[in-house]
């Protein structure tokens, strides 16, 4: 966003994502709970973040870890009570922390009363979901579910198919029905009245479906031929988001962030440009597909570094020019750990964790830190299918075996790509179960918890934790991190990512070595002679001679001049 935009509180903030199920258990059930979040608020305050985004804790059968909501108005007993939630909200506010809730309004659980009534053809709810008759005795279209298989499920009770873009127990809501929208807006207002500070909208750009319900013949090469061209950034999406903004948020100062699946930059500009009155910011995932050769996620592959830089640059420049606003991130509950993916989680654990943090926090947008990222948690490298819990992973494992993969090959792919990689318990200390629970954890604790944990990080002034703390402080003090124009530099370089944040009278220069070997980088055009170092991930500064900087493995520096 250009420098003359009206700054809101979230432009300077850093958001911390909590996946409550794996955060902290206070009851011995083996699953994290709301009291566990309350217990750790002081730790989060120490880190310096201002906003906590909580993934869903609503009543749910937990087929997709809470993204299948059966009751939007109540807290799932496994997390605690509404009183626990209100206490946590109150304690967070006392500490100056804001709470953003995750809400799923593209679909609900098939256990939801709305779905049950719709399936039974209750007149008020009959068209609350997307029901279709068979076509030629089979599914209405060839659209595929994001979790594998066809996206339509037959209901014996109703005698029709319903659409589920995700799990078979997650039925898509019919946004064409005005009463559905009214019910959803009413529900969001209920949580706002409790005092929450904003919402993260799950897969929000999928809510508008092309009402022709056509088969995907693969002719639109912009999209994977699985039907997504007919429901991604659909025909009425901007109309629906404008209505949501008008009916629920108005002129309030709330943070609204949309998760955008397979989106295009033109749409994200529109979604997040304040003049459009839709959302405050957007997540996009193109940079996290650079290890999907030919768009295929479920293969073992290295990441394409130059492509990663080009995608980040495209979004930085495009969103700035279009007055949009990025939510920037490496990690979330659906992605493997970035440290294992883009860094070196063994030989250069701390150096590469700090480097990735520096790169991200130097970009324009609101940075998001995912639990465990701030002290260097890694993928768990689970070597048996029995250790995996995620519905996507267990489904894909069977599909990979059917495709001819050996069990060992399938597990190696899951070790790299599974969503469970980021869902293991937060490693609080070196005691049993990493201090997460006194019971049996719902998913195994990674074996490296004795070396990598919060307690150890807090005791080491040079730890990854304090590097994150310094980056967050820097964001508050350096206006250029908010308003500076992004310019990339030597984008084809195969080892180094270098970019500037340019203001009227000053600029920041971020230079990062993405690999485990020392390398040289030509800085002649960057004129670093009079530049000062604001932050580095090595105690000893870099060597610069003959217009070249010598970068140590995973070295990352922010210069100011």
What are these model-derived regions, one by one?
Residues 1-561:
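Active-site and adjacent substrate-binding regions of carbohydrate-active enzymes
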């Amino acid at each position: 966003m250009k420098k003359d935009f009206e700054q809101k509180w979230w432009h300077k903030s850093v958001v911390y994502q909590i996946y409550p199920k794996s955060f902290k258990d206070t009851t011995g059930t083996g699953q994290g709970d709301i009291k566990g979040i309350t217990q750790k608020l002081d730790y989060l305050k120490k880190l310096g973040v201002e906003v906590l985004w909580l993934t869903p804790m609503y009543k749910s059968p937990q087929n997709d870890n809470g993204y299948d909501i059966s009751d939007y108005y109540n807290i799932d007993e496994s997390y605690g009570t509404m009183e626990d939630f209100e206490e946590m909200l109150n304690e967070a506010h006392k500490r100056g922390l804001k709470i953003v809730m995750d809400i799923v309004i593209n679909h609900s659980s098939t256990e939801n009363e709305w779905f049950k009534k719709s399936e039974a053809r209750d007149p008020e709810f009959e068209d609350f979901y997307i029901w279709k008759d068979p076509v030629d005795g089979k599914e209405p279209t060839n659209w595929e579910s994001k979790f594998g298989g066809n996206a339509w499920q037959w209901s014996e009770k109703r005698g029709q198919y319903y659409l589920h873009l995700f799990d078979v127990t997650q039925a898509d809501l019919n946004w064409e029905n005005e009463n559905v929208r009214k019910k959803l807006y009413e529900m969001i207002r209920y949580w706002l009245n409790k005092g929450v500070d904003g919402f993260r909208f799950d897969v929000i750009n999928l809510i508008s479906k092309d009402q022709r319900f056509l088969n995907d013949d693969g002719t639109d090469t912009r999209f994977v031929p699985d039907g997504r061209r007919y429901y991604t950034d659909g025909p009425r999406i901007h109309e629906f988001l404008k209505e949501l903004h008008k009916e629920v948020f108005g002129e309030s100062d709330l943070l609204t962030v949309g998760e955008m699946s397979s989106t295009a930059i033109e749409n994200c500009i529109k979604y997040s440009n304040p003049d459009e009155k839709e959302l405050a910011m957007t997540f996009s995932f193109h940079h996290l597909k650079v290890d999907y050769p030919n768009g295929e996620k479920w293969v073992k592959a290295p990441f394409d570094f130059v492509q990663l830089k080009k995608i980040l640059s495209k979004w930085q420049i495009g969103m700035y020019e279009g007055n949009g606003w990025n939510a920037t991130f490496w990690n979330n509950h659906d992605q493997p750990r970035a440290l294992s993916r883009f860094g070196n989680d063994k030989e250069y654990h701390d150096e590469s964790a700090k480097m990735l943090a520096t790169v991200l926090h130097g970009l324009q947008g609101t940075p998001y830190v995912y639990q465990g990222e701030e002290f260097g948690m890694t993928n768990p490298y689970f070597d048996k299918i029995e250790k995996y819990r995620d519905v996507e992973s267990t489904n894909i494992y069977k599909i990979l075996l059917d495709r001819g993969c050996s069990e060992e090959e399938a597990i190696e792919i899951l070790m790299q790509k599974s969503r469970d990689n980021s869902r293991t318990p937060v490693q609080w200390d070196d005691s049993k179960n990493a201090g997460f629970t006194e019971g049996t954890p719902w998913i195994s604790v990674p074996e490296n918890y004795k070396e990598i944990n919060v307690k150890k990080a807090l005791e080491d002034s040079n730890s990854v934790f304090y590097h994150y703390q310094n980056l967050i402080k820097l964001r508050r003090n350096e206006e250029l991190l908010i308003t500076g124009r992004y310019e990339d530099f030597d984008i084809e370089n195969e080892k180094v990512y270098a970019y500037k944040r340019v203001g009227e009278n000053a600029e920041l220069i971020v230079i990062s070595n993405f690999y485990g070997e020392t390398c040289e980088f030509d800085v002649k055009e960057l004129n670093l002679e009079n530049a000062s170092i604001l932050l580095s991930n090595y105690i000893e500064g870099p060597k610069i001679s003959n217009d070249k900087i010598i970068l140590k493995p995973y070295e990352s520096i922010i210069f100011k001049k």
